[in-house]
């Protein structure tokens, strides 16, 4: 029987294939009293080691196929496996209660999950709860000798159907066979959606109950552009979906022709399209997709991939490789953004109730705790500056004095290197990431002293709306097109231009096809996004008239009170079909 479902369009693409139901195994067990607690601890250690080996392999595959940024979630999982407090409590429970490892594991991890989930004002801890649940399931499966579903074994064209996909599930998908996936829960900003876009496979999330409606082998049609899903479609519907897929493939082929084209609007106005990267090897994707710059190089992955602080020489080689790989095109390097959801096992930071609003990023760099680490990074960057067009960006800036202090340290290290006879470029732009509302509101003062702004909308929207974008209960508040967000962006861009500086954007909003016309109208100079979004955005921009987009933006800023009103207004100016 044919059934039609509507979900959240999370990743573009159209596919028709057999359903592959990703069923979670039965992990029920009985609590058993034991006398040999040492043997139970040994069983636990073996399961922990097997899980660690498994996750390390999955992480490496994720790095190879998705890049460092997408793979970073597995660092959090590996840290859970190595958490001495939690592992210690599990072993203590085995010894004191004389129960099997399965029972002790569940008791302790359930306690931690409940504790973190109840921290409703702390999205960081709520995310850690999800990590613990995922890791505990893996360890329990090893204790029970049960195999977890392995999407890597899929060897024919399939549509993966699941209640949800964990990061470890998504990292194992082979885009040669998995043409799309559909889940009961999730949204555009969930880990699985982001990974689907990186893999360039269609995804529709949040269908509520597709796992109850689909059997293995059913034919499923998925449109990741519209969010439409059909179970056991008719021949006519299959033909319709295949035609839509061919149209999309044709579009992609047309976009590919724009690889070496300049990014100009229909009336000849140029905008810079840049790409975000996490490692030097991501530069290949930047160039293959025709980006004009690297708009955000997230340097924290250098630290997260090391067993100790990366040395000045190690960092220099990485920065040099990126600058040389870009052949003189601009490279915006963000100084390390450690803290929040990015922890380093070798860097002992104080535990905080809310790390996202705590001691992180530039706050660490300019403190006594992180000063030497910051100076090492700046020296490496300055040495590498002679190999290309370097731009240095400081993250998580709230106060002008924070920028001044960081800039002062940069100037000190520049003078030190010159005194040592080391060549340093004298043409390095220094800017800040605008992700805190306080900095956005004071952009007119910052603009007098910085060389550029890059608006980090992922955090700016969260902080402005007081809503965690990964929390489904409040995800409706994550509104890039809300007039309040558009007004903040407009204020920052105007402040930059008033001082003759440029303003860019490096959050997901920069590559959002609905947001781009509004941002063109506001006058944003640079758009930095995932490399795979560059050509599509260039194609869109070629159809836009800046005068009309300025009119659209002005009306959105002055006439609209809600996101819905902005979207309705945009329909008067843009036909997205």
Swiss-Prot record:
PROSITE patterns: PEP_ENZYMES_2, PEP_ENZYMES_PHOS_SITE
GO cellular component terms, A-Z: cytoplasm
Main location per the UniProt record: cytoplasm
Name of the molecule in the record: Phosphoenolpyruvate-protein phosphotransferase
Binding site for phosphoenolpyruvate: 298, 334, 458-459, 469
Subcellular location: Cytoplasm
The organism of origin for this protein: Streptococcus mutans serotype c (strain ATCC 700610 / UA159)
One Pfam assignment: PEP-utilizers_C
Gene3D superfamilies per record: Phosphoenolpyruvate-binding domains, Phosphohistidine domain, PtsI, HPr-binding domain
Record field: catalytic activity: L-histidyl-[protein] + phosphoenolpyruvate = N(pros)-phospho-L-histidyl-[protein] + pyruvate
Disulfide bonds: none
Entry's free-text remark on domains: The N-terminal domain contains the HPr binding site, the central domain the pyrophosphate/phosphate carrier histidine, and the C-terminal domain the pyruvate binding site.
Gene, per the UniProt record: ptsI
